[in-house]
Design a protein with these regions (language model features):
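N-terminal intrinsically disordered, cationic/polar leader segments
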Residues: 1-151
């Protein structure tokens, strides 16, 4: 009957959402493992940015240079975003495993995924991580669209 059909639809939607969570997790792990996040790669990018500052010919005082370098290093660190994405994936899986009306909670989670993927893109100063961030945003959009179909 109608209840059986709704249960089947619900199971199919759950499987689809779990697939999106798997994709979000895989992209998060790719960003985490990206070679651009190695300290040597970050140092090289910082050195290049500092060189550009110095080449601009403007007088640069030592304190300002240290401040800029610290700022650039902090901006490049996406550890928190990666940790939060992993936590949100685990939360999504728990919600889907629990069953029941989880639409509103998953909608909130999709907003969190969106926020973290946006931050990942804006913080990234490596093309490879930005590309992963953009892929992540696409999967998050698909996840959010499917969540809209939930009760």
């Amino acid at each position: 009957g109608l209840d059986a059909a709704r249960r089947e639809d619900g199971a199919a939607l759950r499987d689809l959402l779990l697939g999106h969570l798997d994709a979000i997790e895989a992209l998060t792990l790719r960003a985490e493992a990206d070679p651009s996040r190695e300290p040597a790669a970050i140092r090289a990018r910082l050195a290049e940015q500092v060189r550009l500052l110095l080449d601009a010919g403007a007088p640069v005082d030592e304190a300002r240079l240290h401040m800029e370098a610290a700022f650039l290093a902090a901006k490049a660190d996406i550890r928190e975003e990666i940790d939060r994405l992993k936590t949100h994936v685990a939360s999504g899986r728990s919600l889907l495993a629990a069953g029941g009306p989880v639409g509103r909670k998953l909608d909130f989670l999709s907003q969190e995924f969106n926020r973290e993927s946006n931050t990942l893109c804006s913080k990234s100063n490596a093309a490879s991580v930005t590309a992963i961030g953009l892929e992540l945003k696409a999967v998050v959009d698909q996840f959010r669209e499917q969540v809209q179909n939930l009760e």
